[in-house]
Amino acid sequence: MPFPTDEISVPQSNLKKTGNGAVHRILSGNRLHLQHGPIDLIIVVDGPEQVQNEAFDQAIHRFNPILEELVTELPILKTPWNPSFPNLKGRVAKRMLEAVQGLDGFITPMAAVAGAVADETRDVMLEVPGIRRLMVNNGGDIAFDLTPGTECRFGVFELKEAPELSTTVGIDDSSPVRGVATSGWRGRSQSLGIADSVTVLARSAAQADASATLVANA
């Protein structure tokens, strides 16, 4: 886990469901788990306990309708980007489209879906003042935020069969990087290339997600 827990003890809670099928629970180590269909987020907030709780509430409220929003525009999102691409309505869908603009004929906005969900969740949580550091991990596609004087480190490993860290990447608040994503033929999504694993750092998780997909498919 990249962030310290600030000595705040958060007990394990029971899984809580909403009417649309989304579920959430608080995990040990001050982490929030959100899951709905294929979307599975682990969130860490570095800040006072009240700030953490408010940020988690923001994340839960925004997360609940995200999958349904994406499903309503799914046929369009599965279309390769082109200069006459139709307008999209959903905030996450717009992030996905922005991440692949200019990549005519190469990939669809779906290449950025995991990163875009992470970005959206991070940004709504940042509406809560007092957060020092924040990380939203969507199956390895990570959006994060840093305040002045803070940093985070990410571990990178090559093979899931041998999960020893290959290297670590340190990022401080002066860096423009706010997104990390990994792709490859060993991952959970289809990859047409030969790369075992490609990790990309970018200004957003959506950009990192789309870029890693492109490189891994080469």
Please name every model-derived segment.
Residues A22-Q35:
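Acidic, low-complexity proline/glycine-rich segments
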Residues P2-Q12, G19-A22, E49-N137, R203-A218:
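Alpha/propeptide regions of enzymes that mature by internal proteolysis
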Residues H36-E49:
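Generic N-terminal amphipathic, Lys/Arg-enriched alpha-helix
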Residues G29, P38-D40, A195:
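A general secondary-structure signal for short beta-strands and their flanking turns/coil
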Residues I26, D46, N53, T79, ...:
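A near-ubiquitous, low-amplitude feature marking generic local secondary-structure context
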Residues A99, N137-A218:
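Conserved mixed alpha/beta catalytic, RNA-binding, or beta-rich assembly cores of soluble enzyme
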